[in-house]
Amino acid sequence: MKPLKLAATLGGVVTLGLAGPAVAAQAVAPHASPVVGHVYVNDNTAAGNTIGGFDRHADGSLTPEAGSPYATGGNGSGAGTASQGALQETPDGRFLLAVDAGSDQISVLRLSGSGVPHRVVGGTVSSHGSSPVSIAITAWGRDDLVYVANAGDPTNGYSGGNYTGFELDRAGILHHIAESTVAVPDGSQLGDVLFNSTGTSVVGTRVATSLVDSFNVGRNGLLYAAPGSPYAAQGPGPLGSEFRPTNPNQLFVSNAHGGPNNGTISAFSVSRNGSLTSIGAGPFADNQTAPCWVEISHDGRFLFTTNTAVPSISRYSIAPNGSMTLIGSTALDPTTQKGPIDLRLSPGGQKLYVVDGGAATISAFRVSGGTLTPLAGAPVTVPGSVAPAGIVVD
């Protein structure tokens, strides 16, 4: 399968990485700061996909886990997935779910008490589509409800894209839900699929046609299109999306393809029936190029977006009604941070971790309100990957 590409809107296309060889697990030296959590990255390697695992220390620094990287059982694409959510953790923290975009599969890995991922026997299954790029998970009774966005075949104009549902049981096995597949027109190029915090709504982005899908989730786990869906994204190239943690009825979408210094973030109000309406004077200017991925502070007051083509991170404050004010942008070092993509906050919200698809690194920042301060020792290299996609922080 040919690599997916991410339009950087700078007169062409930027491909975030080529396939590289896997590397053996490395010995890890003792670290003075105690381990308080972990960071995982989907390495997206073509010849046998792996997950990179890092110990996260109290000072925010990262060290590779002794056994990292960990095989998923499928194959990555070897290049950027142009998506948000290529790696996810279940709400109870027991499993990681990864897209294997090169083999059209999803893999499940069980997390040990010490944070080490282990492949689940029978845990690699068909995604029921071509080029899975994004995963959404919500609690569903004793199990979890999972939806995957299949971008479509990149060698054939992103044909065959769809959203498909699964039930993840307590043993870590994915079961396809009959009649759950929702097809999208050829050429849509899905970039994200996302549940709201209550698990009652699902949204997805169509990058190539600048549309946002909105669905209501039935008791049977099936998706039902909201009235008027899909909706105009209000900007070209919607890619990343995030519901406000403090308000599941507010949705924010990054528009990546507006051109140089013309990126935007859209803000939507989500009604009870799933319909989307614009908030305030949206879309809100980014004044940067290719804002692709979105993260919102746990208190819902600030939004961060990575500008992949610059590279930089834009910072917004969010008003109670969902309108936004651009605070500024944090410039990144283009020699070590060539293409920032997915980003996630630590559980306490005091650290922000950004995976770089161009340099195969992870950057780390201290967060104080809407201010970002780079942490000493970052970025760190993602061993064995030249095209990482997706990040989990726990």
Per-segment meaning from a language model:
Residues N44-A46, R56, A101-G102, L111, ...:
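Short loop/turn segments immediately following the C-termini of beta-strands
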Residues A66-G78, V120-S126, I177-V184, Y224-A232, ...:
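A short beta-strand motif characteristic of beta-propeller blades
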Residues M1-A27:
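Secretory targeting and sorting signals
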Residues P34, T72-D92, S127-D143, P154, ...:
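Beta-rich, blade/repeat-based domains predominating
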